[in-house]
């Protein structure tokens, strides 16, 4: 085993989450502005985001399978980070839509090798302690909030072309942190567990959970793809936009710290359905009240429920639903179908509906309706997910 001793892996995990989500702090909020600065229409932006996001459908499961068969998840993370950086370098050059599509698609495909393995690695070192996971995961939120603020300053001071360079520096930091982590030994997986994985995917509770998460992720697409353009059109500066996004992530950080206690006191179904309902209200506020800084700030605070608590619930579901030997595969499946599939469908639809800003209100209204449908699906889930049902499925 190379790298840091196991007991000292937590600082490296904290740094890895900080850098990983720091990259996303530049990539996600400001990508719409960056592409707009390159002369792309809202339809082109939506199409590019959809095609790039679609690489996340297959990527996580493919990389997870490779990591599982090799028994070396850390090597897969390192390889993914290095190759993602190489793909990202294409954004330094302005040669039109197709080069951006190729470069960002390569970046996204290799980027998907990182997070599922990082989540599994984290739970391994924490002995499946979800409360400690939430605290370590919050370092990613800190990275996101810091880089959103830095991105706003870069945007206002140097323009959109400065953003790719900031993200590249964070990728180098991520690569360094991954080389500090110790390698994991391959988990023991018996043949019954291998056969049981397929059966798990057809269980009603799993289908209901994935359907709800998929639909909710679709509703996030207008926010992720077009919020910075929306804020600019409403008259907010780049720094102000960064502050609003940072407020959302600050609420997310606070939520991660008391997430464990919340799930002990309330049912899984209640918490998740409330988060989805809150998301519906949030998109309606963006549709009709975003011109008011106060109400825009309130809608950003709702990110604590619509993302942070909902994400922690989803991670707990995956950890409890799949046995330890299959969790990497379960994490990859979740990441691919939800963030890849749901994100791609939502991004493409948002690009069509946005109409270069003319359809902004109706886009967020449709997003709210979509979140409402996700809430109805969540209400059909069991109150709690306690055991690993795969053990039953394998018999």
Give, region by region, the residue ranges found by the protein language model.
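Helix-loop boundary and gating motifs at the non-cytosolic
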Residues: 3-53, 206-244
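Helix-loop junctions at membrane interfaces in 12-TM secondary transporters
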Residues: 10, 92-104, 287-299
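Structural signature of the two symmetry-related core transmembrane helices
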Residues: 75-89, 270-285
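Juxtamembrane intracellular "pre-TM" segments in multi-pass secondary transporters
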Residues: 2-7, 181-213
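Interfacial helix-cap and linker-helix signal at transmembrane-aqueous boundaries
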Residues: 35-36, 66-67, 138, 153-158, ...
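Cytoplasmic helix-loop-helix junction between adjacent transmembrane helices
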Residues: 105-139
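Helix-to-loop junctions at the C-terminal end of transmembrane segments
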Residues: 58-72, 155, 254-267, 354-355
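A membrane-interface helix-boundary motif in multi-pass transporters
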Residues: 153-169, 352-371
């Amino acid at each position: 085993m190379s790298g840091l001793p196991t007991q000292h892996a937590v600082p490296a995990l904290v740094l890895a989450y900080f850098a990983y989500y720091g990259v996303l702090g530049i990539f996600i909020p400001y990508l719409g502005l960056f592409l707009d600065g390159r002369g792309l229409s809202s339809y082109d932006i939506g199409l590019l985001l959809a095609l790039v996001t679609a690489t996340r459908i297959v990527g996580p499961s493919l990389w997870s399978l490779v990591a599982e068969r090799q028994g070396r998840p850390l090597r897969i993370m390192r390889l993914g980070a290095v190759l993602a950086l190489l793909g990202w370098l294409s954004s330094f050059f302005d040669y039109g839509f197709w080069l951006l599509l190729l470069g960002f698609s390569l970046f996204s495909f290799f980027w998907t090798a990182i997070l599922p393995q990082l989540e599994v690695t984290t739970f391994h070192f924490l002995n499946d302690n979800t409360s400690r996971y939430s605290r370590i995961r919050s370092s990613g939120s800190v990275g996101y909030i810091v880089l959103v603020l830095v991105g706003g300053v870069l945007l206002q001071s140097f323009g959109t072309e400065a953003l790719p360079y900031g993200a590249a520096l964070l990728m180098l930091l991520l690569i360094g942190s991954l080389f500090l982590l110790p390698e994991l030994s391959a988990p023991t997986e018996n043949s019954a567990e291998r056969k049981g994985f397929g059966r798990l995917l057809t269980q009603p509770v799993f289908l209901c959970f994935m359907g709800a998460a998929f639909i909710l992720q679709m509703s996030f697409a207008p926010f992720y793809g077009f919020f910075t353009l929306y804020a600019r059109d409403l008259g907010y500066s780049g720094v102000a936009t960064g502050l609003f996004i940072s407020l959302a992530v600050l609420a997310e950080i606070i939520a991660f710290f008391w997430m464990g206690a919340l799930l002990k006191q309330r049912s899984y179904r209640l918490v998740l359905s409330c988060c989805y309902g809150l998301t519906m209200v949030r998109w309606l506020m963006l549709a009709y009240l975003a011109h008011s800084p106060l109400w825009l700030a309130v809608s950003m605070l709702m990110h604590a429920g619509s993302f942070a608590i909902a994400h922690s619930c989803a991670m707990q579901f995956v950890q409890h639903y799949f046995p330890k030997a299959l969790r990497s595969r379960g994490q990859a499946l979740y990441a691919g179908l939800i963030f890849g599939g749901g994100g791609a469908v939502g991004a493409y639809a948002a690009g069509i509906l946005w109409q270069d800003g003319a359809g902004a209100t109706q886009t967020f209204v449709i997003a709210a309706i979509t979140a409402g449908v996700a809430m109805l699906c969540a209400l059909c889930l069991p109150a709690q997910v306690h055991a690993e049902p795969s053990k039953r499925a394998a018999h």
